[in-house]
Amino acid sequence: MASNKVSFFLVLCLCILLAGECIESPIFTGNKCSDPTGMDKDGKCLDYCHAQGYPGGSCIGFIDQGYMCVCKVG
């Protein structure tokens, strides 16, 4: 009975670790977006993220900082 609990716990931990790999994590670059409305019309944020090796990026609004470039992972 104890070995079943240990096996269940190990499988549960493995599932949690694998699920964490699939979640997109944003990478905050600290670069302000040039467009005050938050649109990446000129593609600078996307180009920056591609140059850094990330698959994508976009401008996301923050209350205290305005729109910032955020790269996507995964």
Curated annotation (Swiss-Prot):
Signal peptide from the UniProt entry: 1-22
GO CC terms: extracellular region
Compartments, as annotated in UniProt: Secreted
The UniProt record lists the keyword Signal: yes
Keywords: Antimicrobial, Disulfide bond, Fungicide, Plant defense, Secreted, Signal
Disulphide bridges, residue numbers: 33-59, 45-69, 49-71
Gene Ontology biological process terms, A to Z: defense response to fungus; killing of cells of another organism
Stated family: Belongs to the DEFL family.
Protein name in the entry: Putative defensin-like protein 36
Organism: Arabidopsis thaliana (Mouse-ear cress)
Higher taxonomy: Eukaryota, Viridiplantae, Streptophyta, Embryophyta, Tracheophyta
